[in-house]
Curated annotation (Swiss-Prot):
Protein source organism: Pyrococcus abyssi (strain GE5 / Orsay)
Name under which the protein is recorded: UPF0284 protein PYRAB00380
CDD domains for the chain: DMB-PRT_CobT
Matches recorded under SUPFAM superfamilies: Nicotinate mononucleotide:5,6-dimethylbenzimidazole phosphoribosyltransferase (CobT) (SSF52733)
Top-rank taxon, per record: Archaea
GO molecular function: nicotinate-nucleotide-dimethylbenzimidazole phosphoribosyltransferase activity
Protein family according to the UniProt entry: Belongs to the UPF0284 family.
Length: 336
């Protein structure tokens, strides 16, 4: 076994701000999205809720990509509860049940130290396994806003992506500036204090992935889009050698003109991989709309595709498997 895939689940109160996150049919349902994503990877459908996580317009969770890659390449997945409202109904490693607070009103993550410590300990244990690398994905609704807040606090002029083609950048920036006013800081003021940026504005997923990365000393693929840029920026500020890290994402994130993924990755100094998935010929509108800027990434979709490609499958194989899984979902839906 060369690679181990970890899926870190996180929640932040930021996802319940209307208009911030479409990683759930309603702002309230974003609280359930991480556990539903994890459950869907192992079952025909989630167990906590009798529905597949979708955007308000009905676009399926990117977990369908991760599940497709897993079914092809059969790599092992360990689910980690970084900090969520609910525990997933699948076997998982418990780091915390802390949910990130609304940073406009209070410090987002006072418990960051304990979360990092526990995740680091788990990373150190994984070091003892005969694996060469970790691939770490995430499911964290609202996480692109916390990530952008952390990046801004660290001094990066970053704009993060969104699961919507209409990136609510103005709303994000307004929310972030309210948080900065509450904390009494300006952009870039915490460039020398990465953990303070995490404490003030972060979420439990970021803290968990930072801890895992500090504990596991071999190669790490950060499987996510702009949220993993925040993780990378913190690790760099903590003095980590960025040569052992790579971000694996999808071409939909890389091509997102409303965000600065490529520029920010370059500024941090981390190499990136972009999964060349293509759903333009899908017979399902829910998948074709990925090509119109919906969803883009999540649940380690890019990293899972990368693992499938490493195992000898093509991005086309993954796309075909996604089609098959979506067809299965549609069939189940029509039977209910």
């Amino acid at each position: 076994m060369e690679s181990l895939f970890l899926l870190v689940l996180g929640n932040t109160e930021i996802s319940t701000i209307p208009g911030i996150s479409v990683a759930g049919a309603t702002p309230e349902l974003t609280k359930i999205t991480p556990v539903a994503d994890a459950e869907y990877l192992f079952h025909e459908k989630p167990l906590t809720i009798d529905a597949i996580p979708v955007t308000p317009e009905g676009h399926p969770t990117p977990a369908i990509i991760t599940k497709a890659a897993k079914e092809l390449a059969d790599f092992p997945i360990i689910v980690i509860r970084g900090g969520t409202y609910l525990a997933p109904l699948v076997p998982h490693v418990h780091i915390s049940d802390v949910v990130g607070r609304d940073f406009r009103k209070e410090i987002a993550l006072p418990e960051f130290g304990e979360i990092i410590k526990r995740a680091k300990l788990f990373g150190e244990e994984l070091n003892k396994l005969p694996i060469k690398e970790l691939v770490i994905g995430e499911s964290t609704p609202g996480g692109t806003t916390t990530a952008q807040a952390v990046l801004w606090a660290l001094g990066y002029e970053a704009r993060t992506s969104s699961a919507s083609p209409n990136n609510p950048q103005e709303l994000k920036e307004r929310v972030i500036m309210e948080g900065f006013n509450r904390a009494g800081i300006e952009k870039g003021q915490l460039s020398e204090k990465p953990l303070e940026a995490l404490r003030q504005f972060g979420d439990p997923m970021i803290a968990t992935v930072v801890g895992l990365s500090l504990g596991f000393r071999k190669d790490i693929v950060l499987a996510g889009g702009t949220q993993m840029l925040a993780v990378s920026a913190i690790l760099k500020a903590l003095g980590e050698d960025m040569k052992r890290f790579m971000i694996a994402t999808t071409r939909w994130v890389v091509n997102d003109r409303s965000a600065t993924f490529v520029e920010t990755a370059r500024e941090i100094g981390i190499i990136t991989y972009s999964a060349d998935l293509d759903f333009s010929n899908s017979k399902f509108k829910g998948l074709r709309d990925y090509e119109r800027g919906y969803v883009k990434e999540g649940v380690g979709a890019g990293g899972a595709t990368w693992l499938a490609v490493k195992s000898g499958f093509s991005p086309e194989d993954v796309s075909e498997k996604v089609e098959e899984l979506y067809e299965r979902l549609m069939r189940m839906k029509s039977l209910t």
